[in-house]
């Protein structure tokens, strides 16, 4: 197996190496360079492309409600400030000359003693005052009639509202497959009859209510004087 691989490599080397060696029998032929003038292309006019304006309807953006952001309180460590040393300032003592104040003479004031005799106040007796209730007849107030007030009609000019263009929105039909619901069987529930024992209610005793008599003072009615009626004279 190894000998067959070696023979294959040897044949490949003998075939490739002679082709790669230089040919010294024929010298290379010199070919002068050929001048090629540059090709000038005329400028090509490209008219500007006009795009029709695209109408974009206004998009409603609902207001964004941002939840309140909790900011924990910032705790700052106490800053140590060393005490500032201030050297003592020397203040010389201020000398004030003594001020002479002559003594003020105040003569003594005589105040005789005030004697107030005791005042006797006999007790004042006030009998209880009974005021009869005052009767106030009802006051008749005729109804007040207000004339109708004429209010002319208010004319409002028509307000022009331009039509709002809404692009059609395609909504594909929603197909809901039928849902099979098997019938639910509920067995009958037996409820035994509930017997309530009789509740005894004792009789409630209500004492008789005694109302004190209401005092009604007599109402004074003045005598009504009727004027004399004069008839025609009678002839015998």
UniProtKB/Swiss-Prot annotation:
One of its GO terms (cellular component) is extracellular region. The lineage of its organism: Eukaryota, Viridiplantae, Streptophyta, Embryophyta, Tracheophyta. This is Repetitive proline-rich cell wall protein. Residues 27-236 are annotated as: 42 X 5 AA approximate tandem repeats of P-P-V-[EYV]-[KQG]. Residues 1-22 form the signal peptide. The gene is PRP. Residues 143-177, 204-236 are annotated as: Disordered. It is found in: Secreted, Cell wall. It comes from Medicago sativa. Sequence repeats lie at residues 27-31, 32-36, 37-41, 42-46, 47-51, 52-56, 57-61, 62-66, 67-71, 72-76, 77-81, 82-86, 87-91, 92-96, 97-101, 102-106, 107-111, 112-116, 117-121, 122-126, 127-131, 132-136, 137-141, 142-146, 147-151, 152-156, 157-161, 162-166, 167-171, 172-176, 177-181, 182-186, 187-191, 192-196, 197-201, 202-206, 207-211, 212-216, 217-221, 222-226, 227-231, 232-236. Its main location: secreted. It holds the Pfam family Extensin_1.
């Amino acid at each position: 197996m190894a000998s067959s691989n070696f023979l294959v490599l040897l044949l490949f080397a003998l075939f490739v190496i002679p082709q790669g060696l230089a040919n010294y029998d024929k010298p290379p032929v010199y070919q002068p360079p050929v001048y090629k003038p540059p090709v000038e292309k005329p400028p090509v006019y490209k008219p500007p492309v006009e795009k029709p304006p695209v109408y974009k309807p206004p998009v409603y953006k609902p207001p964004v409600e941002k939840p309140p952001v909790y900011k924990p309180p910032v705790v700052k460590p106490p800053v140590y400030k060393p005490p500032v040393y201030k050297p003592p300032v020397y203040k010389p003592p201020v000398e004030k000359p003594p001020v002479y104040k002559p003594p003020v003479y105040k003569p003594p004031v005589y105040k005789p003693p005030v004697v107030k005799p005791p005042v006797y106040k006999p007790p004042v007796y006030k009998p209880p005052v009974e005021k009869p209730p005052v009767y106030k007849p009802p006051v008749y107030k005729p109804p007040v009639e207000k004339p109708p007030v004429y209010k002319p009609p208010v004319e409002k000019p028509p307000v022009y509202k331009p039509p709002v263009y809404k692009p059609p929105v395609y909504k594909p039909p929603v197909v809901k497959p039928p849902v099979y619901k098997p019938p639910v069987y509920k067995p009958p529930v037996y409820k035994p009859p509930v017997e309530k024992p009789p509740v005894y209610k004792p009789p409630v005793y209500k004492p008789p209510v005694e109302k004190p008599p209401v005092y009604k003072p007599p109402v004074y009615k003045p005598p009504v004087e009727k004027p004399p009626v004069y008839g025609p004279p009678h002839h015998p």
